[in-house]
Amino acid sequence: SEMCIRDRAKAVAGHDAVVSAYNPGWTVPDIHDQFLKGTRAIIDGTKAAGVRRLLVVGGAGSLFVAPGVQLVDTPQFPAEWKQGALAAREALNWIRTENTLDWTFLSPPILLQPGERTGQYRLGDEAPLMNGEQPGSISVADLAVAIVDELETPRHVQKRFTVAN
């Protein structure tokens, strides 16, 4: 709603960047719609505030595991995360059409877990990073390092990227 956009604009006005890791909660029955409404409000609020830099932390589901095949569309993708992952993919598709913001979309690796902050990670783009035959992983602390690094030294403006240790 217009009021929702104004509230978000007021919250971020005067800041250099907005980082969104919005998720209404994996157990929310209408996660798909809630995710998209929330993401749209964050994008619109960021624009209304005049903040140009937006970094969205999305999901791994939209990473390409083969030409034309995204992880969320594979039979192995967990059913309990599917609606949220489909919404995150839809949000990425919206953001890709956004030309007034200096946006970046960060897809975490397939495995995101607790762990130590090492400050070390590898960068990827449209495909998940792997450790041999195993899916790549990263600690939440190192994912935060990657977010701050991208904000301080932008390398993926109007692009999606992924990371893993």
What are these regions (language model features)?
Residues 93-114:
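Conserved beta-loop-beta element that borders a ligand/cofactor-binding pocket
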Residues 3-5:
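Short, small-residue-biased leader/transition segments that mark boundaries at the very start
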Residues 20, 26-54, 86, 90:
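NAD(P)-cofactor binding segment of oxidoreductase domains
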Residues 51-52, 126, 130-165:
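Mid/C-terminal beta-alpha module of Rossmann-like enzyme folds, strongest
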Residues 27, 61-66, 111-115:
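Conserved catalytic-site region of short-chain dehydrogenase/reductase
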